[in-house]
Amino acid sequence: DDAYSSVFDYAWPIFKKHKLPFTLFVSTDVIDNKTPGYMSWEEIRILRDNGVTIGSQSKSHPHMHKLSKNKIIKELTISSDRFVSEIGGKPKFFAYPYGEYNLEVLEQVKAHGFIAAFGQHSGVAHKSLGIFELPRFAMNEKYGDMNRFNLAVNALPIPISDLSPKNPLIKRNPPYYGFT
């Protein structure tokens, strides 16, 4: 996530050497603003040209569940326009900034033409999950040692149906969960 320059400088050469595919999720403002520590559009094009899937993470990486419907649409539209201008196409995949979303954000991401979206909740994708609510295992300097990696690649899903509440954004803690 986030198109940090360290991905281009350190992670990508390792992934490339071992022929491991990956997706880079990009918020366009930090790239447009040439924010230190982030990639450039040229580096993103190099990754794209070498088989890396480029996904969207919005325009400004906001807490999208706090935005109005119009602001959500603006975040998605401006970001998509920048991708079309800079890399010649709109990403098919979306990662919710901070992994946070509610039903309104999910619906707008879907309406905007993305084919799948990812949160930041750890878990294994399985057939009972919605394609716009896909989990991921974080792999970074804090949660990326070999034990964590082995746990993630060997994890099995716990298929749950009839999850309650339907809205993934929990405002009450402790929440009242129900599932079968």
Predicted regions and their residues:
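C-terminal active-site subregion of NodB/CE4 polysaccharide deacetylases
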Residues: 4-8, 45, 49, 59-62, ...
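Residue-level detector of anion-binding/catalytic polar loops
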Residues: 21, 53, 115
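Active-site beta->alpha N-cap acidic-glycine motif
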Residues: 1-50
